[in-house]
């Protein structure tokens, strides 16, 4: 481990250990990231000069207003497949004005399973000639391509990739859609999935999952429970989760298109939802013992926190230590922290991903 990686990780460990000490958690489990080639996503502006074109990012100046263009020829934190493709793709784009004209941005989405989706974003309308050129490029480089312009989306192949993780002695396939959220650090994501499954070990009754996304945690966790009800509001994520459940031949998961707040209303009988009836979901038929939450950066709202306090076990994955800290002030009134983990999902940034298991006092 290099000193620069160790230092940034230690700073996160110190911060988390100090911040959460008042909850007397057990020893912090630390899950490191690879030091290079860990990001499965990368987004670059395309910078055009009189006789050149290159990938670029922007660096803010000290005043926070002005930005400096930084040329990017390689990007060591991105997956090796992205780094390998970058110069090949750029050479092809430069050689064909149909593909390079008014090209504004290039986004890469890679997988450990070897698939690659490249999104080309333009400041012009895309025509049939562009589509033919993009098809030839996709074939030549063995990638999927998507062209975007205002009000336009042209898909060459698919607008998604399929990731594959080995876990719990089996393989899990995940549909990852270009515009939807996915965990960017696949190696650390696998460690998070394993940790969550370990935290669920010995659970009885059924699992409720709020904010399930594309079913990232839902699929492996389903092996630890008799029945699972997962909720998610974003339509594209719900469709991806249902595809993932079907592709992985898992038959004990139901997905409800509800927000956490809406689920609370339905669970407490305050409101009926046609969406539940249409999906043939009877919430009252579940006997929940464990709830799994992976909320957005804003954390969990007060009503949902009250709901969580009624469960025997809470597995909480957090992408924001500050909102986790605030939420734990409420949850530790009824539960104690029995597992505590740090996942270095975003090395070399201040972002910290963490996990806690809470069990009823």
From Swiss-Prot:
Gene3D superfamilies: 2.40.50.1070, Vaccinia Virus protein VP39 (3.40.50.150). One of its GO terms (molecular function) is tRNA (uracil(54)-C5)-methyltransferase activity, S-adenosyl methionine-dependent. Keywords: Methyltransferase, S-adenosyl-L-methionine, Transferase, tRNA processing. It is an enzyme of class 2 (transferase). The gene is trmA. It comes from Acinetobacter baumannii (strain SDF). S-adenosyl-L-methionine binds at residues 183, 211, 216, 232, 294. SUPFAM superfamilies: S-adenosyl-L-methionine-dependent methyltransferases. Dual-specificity methyltransferase that catalyzes the formation of 5-methyluridine at position 54 (m5U54) in all tRNAs, and that of position 341 (m5U341) in tmRNA (transfer-mRNA). It comes from the Bacteria. Its EC number is 2.1.1.-, 2.1.1.35. The active site is at 319 (nucleophile), 353 (proton acceptor). GO terms for cellular component: cytosol. Belongs to the class I-like SAM-binding methyltransferase superfamily. RNA M5U methyltransferase family. TrmA subfamily. This is tRNA/tmRNA (uracil-C(5))-methyltransferase. The keyword Signal does not apply. It catalyses: uridine(54) in tRNA + S-adenosyl-L-methionine = 5-methyluridine(54) in tRNA + S-adenosyl-L-homocysteine + H(+); uridine(341) in tmRNA + S-adenosyl-L-methionine = 5-methyluridine(341) in tmRNA + S-adenosyl-L-homocysteine + H(+). One of its GO terms (biological process) is tRNA methylation. The keyword Aminoacyl-tRNA synthetase does not apply.
């Amino acid at each position: 481990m290099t000193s620069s990686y160790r230092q940034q990780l230690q700073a996160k460990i110190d911060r988390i250990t100090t911040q959460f000490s008042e909850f007397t958690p057990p020893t912090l489990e630390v899950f490191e990231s690879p030091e290079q080639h860990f990001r499965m996503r990368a987004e670059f502006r395309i910078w055009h000069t009189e006789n050149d074109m290159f990938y670029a990012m922007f660096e803010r100046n000290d005043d926070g207003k002005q930005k400096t263009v930084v040329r990017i020829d390689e990007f060591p934190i991105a997956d090796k497949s992205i780094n390998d493709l970058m110069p090949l793709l750029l050479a092809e784009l430069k050689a064909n004005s149909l593909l390079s004209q008014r090209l504004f941005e290039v986004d890469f989405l890679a997988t450990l399973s070897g698939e690659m989706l490249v999104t080309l974003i333009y400041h012009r309308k895309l025509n049939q000639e562009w589509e033919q050129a993009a098809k030839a490029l996709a074939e030549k480089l063995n990638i999927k391509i998507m062209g975007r312009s205002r009000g336009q989306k042209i898909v060459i192949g698919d607008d998604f990739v399929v990731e594959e993780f080995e876990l719990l002695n089996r393989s899990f396939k995940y549909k990852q859609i270009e515009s939807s959220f996915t965990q960017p650090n696949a190696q650390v994501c696998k460690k998070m999935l394993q940790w969550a499954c370990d935290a669920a070990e010995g659970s009885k009754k059924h699992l409720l999952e709020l904010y399930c996304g594309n079913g990232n945690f839902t699929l492996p966790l389903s092996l630890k429970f008799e029945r699972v009800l997962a909720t998610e509001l974003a339509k594209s994520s719900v469709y991806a989760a249902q595809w993932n459940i079907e592709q992985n031949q898992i038959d004990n998961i139901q997905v409800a298109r509800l927000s956490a707040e809406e689920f609370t209303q339905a669970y407490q009988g305050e409101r009926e939802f046609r969406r539940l009836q249409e999906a043939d979901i009877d919430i009252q038929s579940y006997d929940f013992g464990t709830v799994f939450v992976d909320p957005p950066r804003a954390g969990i709202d007060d009503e949902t926190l009250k709901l969580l306090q009624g469960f025997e076990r809470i597995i909480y994955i957090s992408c924001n230590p500050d909102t986790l800290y605030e939420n734990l002030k409420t949850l530790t009134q009824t539960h104690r922290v029995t597992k505590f983990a740090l996942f270095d999902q975003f090395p070399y940034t201040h972002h910290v991903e963490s996990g806690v298991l809470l069990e009823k006092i």
